[in-house]
Amino acid sequence: MPVNGARRSDERMFMTAIDFSDVSKTYGDKAVVSALSFRVSPGECFGLLGPNGAGKSTIARMILGMTAPDAGKITVLGVPVPAQARLARKGIGVVPQFDNLEPEFTVRENLLVYSRYFGMNTRKVEAVMSSLLEFARLESKVNARVSELSGGMKRRLTLARALINDPQLLVMDEPTTGLDPHARHLIWERLRSLLTRGKTIILTTHFMEEAERLCDRLCVLEGGRSIAEGRPHDLIDELIGCEVIEIYGGDPHELESLVGPYADRIEISGETLFCYVSDPEQVRVRLRQRAGLRILQRPPNLEDVFLRLTGREMEK
């Protein structure tokens, strides 16, 4: 179930906002997406989580009808895509991975120009512009050129632009890549407010914290395939379920023989030993015998889920 209770009446007509059924896409001899199936409910934030090259951006392009699948069926807002992609896009707002704002236009001019893709007249755009700029916290920048904005401001303007047509569905491709932590948290706060208003969001990301904070459900991708799907905390509980101790500064294989008998499970990634334990104190007692180690004890997270599923850490 979505984290929010609000639902727009026009969204209730669709049992699913997005339906992928056995979708595949190949470029040359490389399978980018392989027999992928998932459904996104209206009012839900659904995440596509995976490293670069996992197929996330290709999936986003297929949702928009910009890339045709080689096999399978895609339905978006009740219509088949790409066959009726133009109709579907009337109800979609897009936040691309890289900003494509007009740098020499002002904030106001960027919104006006983009609105013309939806046949909106200037009077209608002016009527909603102040609320969009307030939402994006850009009221004081309405006449500033895009080239004068910070990276975080540009991303917030791109988000405001995506909302110009009051879409039912937002497709967001790596929306906080390249932002500093403060700017990233501000975008997350804005997205949570959209969910409380009943918007549907599909989000591609490789940020584990972003997926945990925003997504009702997510699909973990590797090599264009789904390797897990579910609620973030359900995946963490089912696949990990215990405390994690990260150990640095020694030979991980030697450390494994030292603490392995007291761990539920051990994973090694590079120079780091990940020790999954129900009783952390027993492991910490053994580690005190070794000088020069750096030790971090923490709750499990989606990074641990990915490591458990693939045997490696998420590549940024």
UniProtKB/Swiss-Prot annotation:
GO cellular component: plasma membrane
Lineage: Bacteria, Pseudomonadati, Pseudomonadota, Alphaproteobacteria, Hyphomicrobiales
Protein topology in the membrane: Peripheral membrane protein
Residue numbers binding ATP: 50-57
Stored Pfam families: ABC_tran
Subcellular location per the Swiss-Prot or TrEMBL entry: Cell inner membrane
Main localisation: membrane
Subunit organization: The complex is composed of two ATP-binding proteins (NodI) and two transmembrane proteins (NodJ).
Domain (ABC transporter): residue spans on this chain: 18-248
Family label: Belongs to the ABC transporter superfamily. Lipooligosaccharide exporter (TC 3.A.1.102) family.
CDD domains, sorted: ABC_subfamily_A (cd03263)
Protein name in the entry: Nod factor export ATP-binding protein I
UniProt-listed Enzyme Commission number(s): 7.6.2.-
UniProt keywords, alphabetically: ATP-binding, Cell inner membrane, Cell membrane, Membrane, Nodulation, Nucleotide-binding, Plasmid, Translocase, Transport
